[in-house]
Amino acid sequence: MDAKKAIFNRRTIHFFENKKVSENIIKDAIEAANQAPCHRSTFPWRFYSVSLKKRMQILDLAIEIKLKKKQINENAENIIKEKYLNPSHLLITSQILDSNLNIQKEDYAACSCAIQNLSISLASDGVFSKWSTGAITKNPKTYEIIDINSKKEEIIGFIWIGYGKNLPKITRPLIDQIYKEI
């Protein structure tokens, strides 16, 4: 699939089939992510492929966080379990932190480009993803589970990867709403 078609086919998916994505597709997507532009050649992105054991620990933490906000019934808990366990892969994406706040901002933009490249590469192989940045990505226990030093790296998202259920139809703004010649 050419790049433009992959860009147009890329979608954020919220529900995944319980079907495995090949490691070759994942590795190709990481290679694509690593081609992202970055100012000053900092290459600030890091990707962690989360094992099932670690994913179960993160799932337990997600339920714990949810229970602090409100009671959840068995059905809601099953939906959370499906969300965490059905995707083929969970990648945790982090950014190497720089002491200079301007460089940190540039590096976040570079990490965003890397995630977009990853998503487009996956889409070119008929695989979908979701970049999530919820409370669990900022929780100190997540850093402990994944063994990330929060003084050196910041988790900027979970990337859920897999084959999608119920592909969404997106209505995008018209080009004249987002683009002007001046």
Language-model features and meaning:
Residues 88-91, 157:
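Structural motif
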Residues 3-12, 151-182:
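C-terminal helix-cap and adjacent tail motif
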Residues 52-57, 63-64, 97-99, 140, ...:
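Short, charged/polar surface micro-motifs in flexible loops or helix N-caps
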Residues 62-72, 102-106, 144-147:
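Short, surface-exposed loop/helix-turn segments at secondary-structure junctions
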Residues 39, 123-124, 151:
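Arginine/glycine-rich "motif VI" loop of SF2 helicases in the C-terminal RecA-like domain
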Residues 93-94, 160:
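Short beta-strand segments
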Residues 1-87, 182:
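N-terminal amphipathic, basic helical "cap/leader" segment at the start of enzyme domains
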Residues 33, 91, 97-145:
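Small-aliphatic-rich amphipathic alpha-helix that forms the alpha element of a beta-alpha
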